[in-house]
Amino acid sequence: MELRSRRSAEAYLVTPEEPAKNKSERSIESNERVGTREAKSENTSVFSPAYSDTATTDSSKKVDDNEYYNFTSHFMPSLKNTRELENTILNLIQRIKEGDDETLVSEKDLILSVLNRSLASTSHWKLQAQLSELRATSEGRYAVETNLLKKEVEFLKNKTPKTNESASSAELRPLLERPLKRKLSLPGLAQRPLSTGARLEGGYGGVSPNSWKTKVPKLPLPASRPSLNLSPQKVPTGTDKVEEDTKIDTLELVENNKPHPRMRRRSDNPATNEYVRVFHLEKKEPKSRKK
């Protein structure tokens, strides 16, 4: 389980790939990949930082190699290239151990290319380690911020729960009691008779036909509104009424046909013009009595 968790964590580390391999490296890897795995001695132990933190023996390494190769072949190519580079280095070490001094000269180009790829792979995974550290710090900071927010919300919720509940209950009690009091204060209306025959017989259920009218509450009469006249009103007497009648008889309403500043003339037809009609009171001319 630890091996799979470590590989799944490494699968997220992705950066530009390492340089391409030479033809000689490809031929060596294709021909000697299987042979070198079986030709290793039982006493030697191999340290593989790509997938293990401790040295492993050949008995347990065969299973891990097959599992890890199948895993990396379907995932990120950077892991696959790193694993292939590891196999190439192991093959090259084995060939140098078994060979003579001439092998160093013959395999000079291969050694240089492997060293170059090793440097690229080292820089690649060093960058990935730095990125993982930064990601871990950012995730830890985010977790701390979320925990602080949760604690703050819980503190605000549990700050004064008792006082809030008592105040809310005290406010709700009168609101719940008011409609009940109103219902009890209203007079109960008797049921109306179902037919005219029941009315003639004395009412339905022993109730007189006009008893429900007496129990209906009467609405208050609308209050009389004061007049809009600003002048103080006087109680009219008999002499005042006679004087007002004489004044009304001596005055008449006459329309003023002079042009007015508020008049609007839109056409020659006076019926369509929108204007303000001005009237004034004039004294009536005394009619000449016929002799």
UniProtKB/Swiss-Prot annotation:
The modification Phosphoserine is found at residue 267. The keyword Plastid does not apply. It is found in: Cytoplasm; Nucleus. The keyword Signal does not apply. Its main location: cytoplasm. Residues 42-58, 226-236 have a biased composition (Polar residues). One of its GO terms (cellular component) is cytoplasm. Present with 450 molecules/cell in log phase SD medium. This is Uncharacterized protein YDL129W. It comes from Saccharomyces cerevisiae (strain ATCC 204508 / S288c).
